[in-house]
Design a protein with these regions (language model features):
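Class I S-adenosyl-L-methionine-dependent methyltransferase catalytic core
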Residues: 11-19
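Non-catalytic DNA-recognition/assembly elements of restriction-modification systems
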Residues: 145-154, 250-332
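A glycine-rich phosphate-binding loop feature that marks nucleotide/adenosyl-phosphate handling sites
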Residues: 9, 164-168, 235, 239-245, ...
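Acidic/histidine-rich catalytic neighborhood
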Residues: 18-20, 284-285
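Adenylate-forming
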Residues: 6-11, 41
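Polybasic, glycine- and aromatic-enriched phosphate-binding surface used to engage nucleic acids
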Residues: 33, 43-265, 269
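Conserved Class I SAM-dependent methyltransferase catalytic core
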Residues: 1-6, 25
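Conserved beta strand-loop-helix elements of the APE1-like EEP
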Residues: 19-34
Length: 332
């Protein structure tokens, strides 16, 4: 690759102007020494030119390599897995109104409802529930004709265990929830801790028994830069992946107890400030136009604590962070 324009927003003068995200790559079968990268601090602004020794497939001045799927994390960290999959054709999942209406006609079913969590529910504070029949009493089940009808409907296309979710992968402890999809407009992907009683839904991700340090690293600027360059997209929105993003992420090496404690304290501060806005959704809190100043400051302080875990170097911008991460990835 001789030169490259990193991602920018392209538009034309057509009446129905669609947003198109573009990269420009100039390459040949021979090498040159004077390579150039055109970087965009903002995808809607003009680029600035930077000389490069080598331009890799991620359009960064670094060695050539491809990040591929991994079944296990690159580093010694807790496994990230997907949540449970209903595979029920909409029979076992209920909105709050649907749940209340169902309980009115089937009162015995009330204790078998459990809250579930997908990205939409988590980010927008929308209650959603599942009819959870894993430990249902057979005698009670026979008394609930409307529940039996649901089971009969599911049995038509999934005969083996029609009263259960198709795939059950519920954490055994309180866990960290990571939505698969998040808007590219957000500076940070909203993630958070959930009680083990809440069922996480596939295709979203969980880390069972996660720590404040885990939360701090994954909600940091360093991790977001990795996400920005490595993860898949739907339109321009992030499409997170455990096998590509998390399992390949180069966590900081040789972190001291002092550094770790600093990350934990700053991470807790982010959670404390979020809890002050109990009437706001995460969509409200992480919209760049409405993000509270004290929450933004708390994230910036957390970013500094995580930066410090990656060494004493002062990282001026995200380009320096990603180049450092790619170098660390190769060391692992």
């Amino acid at each position: 690759i001789h030169f490259a324009h990193q991602t920018f927003n392209w538009s034309n003068e057509a009446k129905s102007n669609a947003a198109v995200y573009v990269v420009i790559i100039g390459f040949a079968s021979f090498d040159i020494t004077n390579k150039k990268i055109f970087e965009y601090e903002n995808i809607n602004e003009e680029p600035f030119e930077k000389e490069a020794k080598n331009i890799n497939p991620y359009l960064v001045d670094s060695n050539d390599f491809f990040i591929e799927k991994r079944s296990k994390p690159l580093c010694n960290v807790t496994k990230m897995q997907t949540g449970s999959r209903a595979n029920d054709q909409g029979k076992l999942l209920f909105s709050e109104d649907e749940k209340n209406e169902f309980i009115q006609k089937e009162p015995l079913s009330e204790k078998y409802f459990r809250q579930v969590m997908g990205a939409k529910e988590f980010i927008n504070s929308i209650p959603r529930f599942a009819l959870w029949l894993e430990d249902v009493n057979p005698s009670e089940l026979r008394q609930m004709k409307y529940v039996l009808q649901i089971i009969e409907d599911i049995k038509k296309f999934r005969d083996k265990t029609p009263h259960l979710f198709g795939s059950i992968r519920n954490p055994k402890h309180n866990y960290l929830f990571i939505p698969q999809m998040s808007s590219q407009r957000r500076e940070y992907i909203p993630i958070g801790f959930l009680n083990k009683s809440i069922i996480p839904l596939d295709p979203h991700f969980v880390i069972d028994k996660a720590t404040l340090y885990d939360f701090g690293i994954l909600t940091s600027k360093f991790h977001m830069v990795w996400v920005d360059y490595v993860c898949g997209r739907l339109k321009s929105d992030y499409r997170y992946s455990n096998s590509i993003v998390y399992n390949n992420y180069p966590f900081p090496k040789n972190v001291s107890e002092k550094q770790k404690k600093a990350v934990e304290e700053k991470a807790q501060n982010v959670l404390n400030i979020r809890s002050q806005f109990s009437d706001c959704s995460l969509a409200d809190l992480y919209d760049p136009l409405s993000m509270p100043p004290n929450l933004k400051k708390a994230h910036q302080e957390l970013d500094k604590a995580v930066d410090n875990c990656y060494g004493s170097k002062l990282f001026k911008n995200d380009k320096e962070r990603i180049e450092f991460l790619f170098g660390l990835y190769e060391e692992y």
